[in-house]
Amino acid sequence: MPSAPSRTLSSGTVSPVPSPSMPPAPSILPGLALALGVAVVSMLVAPLLPGISALVLAIVVGVVLANVVPLPRAAAPGLAIASKKLLRAGIVLLGLQVALGDLASLGIGMLLVVVAVVGVGILGTVQLGRLVGVGRHLTVLIACGFSICGAAAVAAAAGVTDPDDEREEDTVTAVALVVLCGSLMIVLVPAAAALMGLHGETAGLWAGASIHEVAQVVAAGGAIGGGAALTVAVIVKLARVLMLAPVMAVMSMQQRRHGAKDGKQPPLVQLFVVGFLAMVLVRSFMPLPEPVLEAGSLLQTLLLAAAMFALGTGVRISLLKQVGPRPFLLAALSTVLVASVALGGVLLVA
């Protein structure tokens, strides 16, 4: 009979990580309570840190906590649930933030720019990763995070390419690079836009098409001048978020073609991708009251932040120290690539 999968805690002990459907409710409560509690605190603190989302803050807390304070063995089953089930539920609810009507207001030209940014960004980053010598899995996570929507895209891609969490260090490394490069872009994009004579909505379009995290786009849009610039920046960013669905679907099909290590075929399209698209349609064609949308946004952030914390607890800093300079070089090149494609597209259609 095959042995159950295990999870190594920071204390060096190993505890079983059952499948999400296996543990009884009482056994998952400690880990879920810990993850959700940290998520709530992250949501309260994140607004005080411009450009840093609750998701990023939660994963940092998870890494630090797991490597400084021995986590109780009782938390392992709940953390396993949080890193899988809560992650997928949060991505589904992310679809409620995207309204097709808002995206249509950008015009076909700008929507094509968004497709080009995501497509060229991902394919180009994968090629750059080969040239620089970064492992394929980490390269794919960087490509998705930098081209689509930051930490959420990294986690979604990891859920498709690493369903057993065997390479959690790659996930945390990619998120850390999103924070580093995206934070620099909060300053660089408004400054570069001013130097090039781009103002108002044009600068906002570039910010939304080039910066990694939604929170970072909001910070940059405010620095550009707020108002219309901030509005279009966020709408363009949400158009990139919508690209999460087709990209994850393509990645799922690639995984299916290559097959899993245990011989089992992964699903043709991950269920959370279908759920994400369903929520986009609900937001676009059903009159949802503002309190419902606000509640959905809060719940989505809560679930994703809890999942990020859980992912962070599985990471050992000693392994992160072995990353080396190559991923940083790839992140810089990917940022330049995405920003350049975005700028060229905006100048063509603006």
What does each model-identified segment do?
Residues P77-G90, L111-V115, G135-F146, E169-L177, ...:
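Cytoplasmic-side transmembrane-helix entry/capping segments in multi-pass membrane proteins
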Residues G221-G263:
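Oxyanion-binding "anion nests"
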Residues L49-V64, A82-L86, L106-G119, A143-F146, ...:
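Structural signature of hydrophobic alpha-helical transmembrane segments
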Residues P2-G12, P16-P18, M22-S83, L93-G101, ...:
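Structural signature of multi-pass alpha-helical membrane transport proteins
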Residues R136-L184, T202-G226:
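Alpha-helical membrane segments and immediately flanking helix-loop junctions
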Residues G90-R136, G159-V175, V179, G324:
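Helix-loop-helix hairpins and the membrane-proximal interhelical loops
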Residues L44, L100-G109, A193-A203, G222-V232, ...:
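Helix-coil boundary and interhelical linker segments in multi-pass alpha-helical membrane proteins
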Residues L112-F146, M185-G197, G314-V315, K321-A350:
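Transmembrane alpha-helices that form the ion-translocation and gating core
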